Amino acid sequence: MIHSKKLTLGICLVLLIILIVGYVIMTKTNGRNAQIKDTFNQTLKLYPTKNLDDFYDKEGFRDQEFKKGDKGTWIVNSEMVIEPKGKDMETRGMVLYINRNTRTTKGYYFISEMTDDSNGRPKDDEKRYPVKMEHNKIIPTKPLPNDKLRKEIENFKFFVQYGDFKDINDYKDGDISYNPNVPSYSAKYQLKNDDYNVKQLRKRYNIPTNKAPKLLIKGDGDLKGSSVGSKNLEFTFVENKEENIYFTDSVQYTSSEDTSYESN
């Protein structure tokens, strides 16, 4: 009888320890997930910024990477990648460097085509067309081969200008992950075609699939805040060995000393 009571007590003690450990782990995970969501929400508040000139007066997270007096530079990037079955992968997008010190913006529009060389190895053929921005207008700074490309560049809109995440907290069944070794973190959501941002992308791009995309929000760097690291959005419509269709976007605030670009 005494042995039975000791055994029962021992089992209860083990179960209690398991419950306590489980509760601690769950609490820690929930706290970290909330911190990840809060970190992303700070970035998503920038959407939409319809007038890119507004970035001259916006300040992001500053740390010791910034020199005294440096107001920083915003880097905005949007690109659409389409690889239909049996065809080459083509990427079209634009990058702008919005310098808050000089209140000037330069960058480039790019068209990249992934093909195979004579040995069957992947080859990335990218062409860049330098641009500047004045009064929220994109202006090519070098002659272009045709008017179609000129209109494409002048009419280009970054996702940050029309994307809107006011309903982000209503997204259901998000898959949140965290890797402390990098550190990196992400949140993934399955969207529907009636989602506002999905409709905006379909309005602006000829997306050759009716599949609704998954939204992946990913970042790296210190969760508490750091100018070293990045946060990116990715809308993946199709992803497999034969076909890839996805859109990526990023808005990054960094020290002006760390920014450089090349155009050809």
Swiss-Prot record:
It is a single-pass membrane protein. The keyword Transmembrane applies. Belongs to the staphylococcal tandem lipoprotein family. Keywords: Cell membrane, Membrane, Transmembrane, Transmembrane helix. The chain crosses the membrane at residues 7-27. It comes from Staphylococcus aureus (strain N315). It is found in: Cell membrane. InterPro entries: Csa, Csa_sf. GO terms for cellular component: plasma membrane. NCBIfam families: SA_tandem_lipo. Pfam families: DUF576. This is Uncharacterized protein SA2269.
